[in-house]
């Protein structure tokens, strides 16, 4: 179903009466004109007054304000989305800064945990393991033929909350909402998918309301065969799809990305999207301090697929700035629950092995511990940047932050774990422990910190700055793959839009109200790089920009004309 053509063109549709009112992509509610009500058998089915979308949005905003809890606000917005998608996106667009934390992190975490309890109406595709041999038929049941973006999860590692089974569907729904709200991708082009391979969450298995397959998770060869069946079915149904892997467990995330990134246009937002926005933030923060990222020493807490993905992209950026690969890797230190990753540590995962430090280079360190803790690393490395992707709250202690600040006058501290209940340290504490000198960026939204009568804005290192623009760029350019260079171009473009760099003050990342401008710029950079990399047909810059404009959907009602099926 095409919904992105210019507003001047009417849309010819075959649906009428109550069926039309039940179709979220087409429903206008009280905004159907008198003529449309007559032509589509809606007379008497709606109140007398014909309203504009702004009048509808104002009523919805007043209703929204009447809800007291974030989860109730989330449920309300999801209800609008499942009733009238155009109104939903107009409302979100009008109040993006207020509503983004409600439709996505941190509130979406609670929505995933309570998915079966708060379930109202079907959205997206649920593919359970018992139905694995019917995937082609299942995907044929999707009514929208022109799907261009799929976000898929298996629900095993939802934010920092772990295994949520099919409750993980809240993540693809929320992510795709941001593709549209921030990146202008028509909701008619998007499809959320959950692969229901069971759950190891005993609380869910014991819950009489749980709506997923009640079975322990399948693993190993059975699991990978199931995912492969899904990938092949998607390629058959939509050969030019952009597929985003979301919230897969560490043991599966990197292998799936490695296996499929050159087979289908795909990326993993937890690994590559998080890395791209983090690197963009660090490039901007370094420039604001009058230096380059290649001059910084960086310590990570958390050496999973997300942390290692960020580290590898940092290393790639510092090589672009002139470092050799060996010199770049010597500036990055990875700490996990077993301590600093070293070349003598057993049982490392394949993606961790290139990020170890050589024990021979650590012999001069001031420590008597066999296992090198985060405090040991901070004390000896004297880092400029500390990044948390551990998923564990409170691990950036006062002692660690003060030790870092002792050797770094303006430390950059980024507790990126989601949701807020999992953050390594709160911005309030970090600002206080560094006497107001830290630059703080978080994974979840936090209010500005007031410390000694001064206001410190807290940047949210939100993947929404990156993935909507990547999606728009891929669609506009027709890219067949997402390369590392395309991701780096997104990071560089984000850094160029930093108010702190451009104005000498303000946040290190753009305000959310400007996110559509940033997404368009990233889309152009990504599309241009795709052309340079040979994964998209080369066009002029003007043609690429026109393609971006043509694909940028706006939440506006179109005139309807009746046609037969």
From Swiss-Prot:
Keywords: Metal-binding, NAD, Oxidoreductase. The keyword Transit peptide does not apply. It holds the Pfam family malic. This is NAD-dependent malic enzyme. The record marks 270 as: Important for activity. Divalent metal cations. Prefers magnesium or manganese. Its cofactor is Mg(2+); Mn(2+). It catalyses: (S)-malate + NAD(+) = pyruvate + CO2 + NADH; oxaloacetate + H(+) = pyruvate + CO2. The active site is at residues 104, 175. Belongs to the malic enzymes family. The gene is maeA. It is an enzyme of class 1 (oxidoreductase). A divalent metal cation binds at residues 246-247, 270. GO terms for cellular component: cytosol. It comes from the Bacteria. CDD domains: NAD_bind_1_malic_enz. InterPro entries: Aminoacid_DH-like_N_sf, Malic_enzyme_CS, Malic_N_dom, Malic_N_dom_sf, Malic_NAD-bd, Malic_OxRdtase, NAD(P)-bd_dom_sf, NAD_malic_enz_proteobac. NAD(+) binds at residues 157, 270, 418. GO terms for biological process: malate metabolic process. Its EC number is 1.1.1.38. GO terms for molecular function: malate dehydrogenase (decarboxylating) (NAD+) activity; metal ion binding; NAD binding; oxaloacetate decarboxylase activity.
């Amino acid at each position: 179903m095409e919904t992105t053509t210019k507003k001047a063109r009417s849309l010819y549709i075959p649906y009428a009466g109550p069926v039309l009112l039940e179709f979220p992509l087409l429903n206008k509610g009280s905004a159907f004109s008198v003529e449309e009500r007559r032509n589509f058998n809606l007379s008497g089915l709606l109140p007398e007054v014909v309203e504009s979308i702004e009048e509808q949005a104002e009523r919805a905003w007043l209703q929204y304000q009447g809800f007291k809890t974030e989860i109730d606000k989330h449920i309300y917005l999801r209800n609008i989305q499942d009733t009238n998608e155009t109104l939903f996106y107009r409302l979100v667009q009008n109040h993006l800064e207020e509503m983004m934390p409600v439709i996505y992190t941190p509130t979406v975490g609670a929505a995933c945990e309570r998915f079966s309890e708060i379930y109202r109406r079907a959205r997206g595709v649920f593919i359970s393991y018992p139905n694995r041999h019917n995937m082609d038929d299942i995907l044929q049941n999707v009514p929208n033929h022109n799907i261009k973006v799929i976000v898929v999860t298996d629900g095993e590692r939802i934010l920092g909350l772990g295994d949520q089974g099919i409750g993980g569907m809240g993540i693809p729904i929320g992510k795709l909402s941001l593709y549209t709200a921030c990146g202008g991708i028509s909701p008619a082009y998007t499809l959320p998918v959950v692969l229901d391979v069971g759950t190891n969450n005993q609380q869910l298995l014991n819950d009489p309301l749980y709506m997923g397959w009640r079975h322990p998770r399948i693993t190993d060869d059975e699991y990978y065969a199931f995912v492969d069946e899904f990938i092949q079915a998607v390629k058959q149904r939509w050969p030019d799809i952009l597929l985003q892997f979301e919230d897969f467990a560490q043991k599966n995330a990197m292998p799936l990305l490695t296996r499929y990134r050159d087979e289908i246009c795909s990326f993993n937002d937890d690994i590559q999207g998080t890395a791209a926005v983090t690197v963009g933030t660090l490039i901007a923060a370094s420039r604001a301090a009058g230096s380059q990222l290649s001059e910084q020493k960086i310590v990570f807490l958390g050496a999973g697929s997300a942390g290692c993905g960020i580290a590898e992209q940092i290393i790639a950026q510092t090589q672009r700035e002139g470092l050799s690969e060996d010199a770049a890797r010597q500036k990055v230190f990875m700490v996990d629950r077993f301590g600093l990753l070293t070349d003598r540590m057993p049982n490392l995962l394949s993606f961790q092995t290139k990020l170890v430090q050589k024990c021979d280079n650590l012999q001069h360190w001031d420590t008597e511990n066999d296992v090198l803790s985060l405090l040991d690393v901070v004390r000896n490395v004297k880092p400029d940047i500390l990044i948390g992707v551990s998923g564990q709250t409170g691990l950036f202690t006062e002692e660690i932050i003060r030790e870092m600040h002792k050797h770094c006058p303006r430390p950059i501290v980024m507790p990126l774990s989601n949701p807020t209940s999992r953050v390594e340290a709160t911005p309030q504490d970090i600002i206080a422990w560094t006497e107001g000198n830290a630059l703080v960026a978080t994974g979840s939204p936090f209010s500005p910190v007031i410390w000694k009568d001064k206001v410190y804005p807290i940047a949210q290192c939100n993947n929404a700055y990156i993935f909507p623009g990547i999606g728009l760029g891929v669609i506009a350019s027709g890219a067949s793959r997402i390369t590392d260079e395309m991701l780096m171009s997104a990071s560089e473009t984000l850094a160029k839009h930093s108010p702190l760099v451009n104005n000498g003050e303000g946040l290190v990342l753009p305000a959310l109200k400007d996110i559509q401008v940033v997404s368009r710029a990233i889309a152009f950079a990504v599309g241009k790089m795709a052309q340079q990399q040979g994964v998209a047909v080369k066009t002029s810059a003007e043609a690429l920009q026109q393609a971006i404009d043509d694909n940028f959907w706006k939440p506006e009602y179109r005139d309807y004309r009746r046609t037969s099926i």
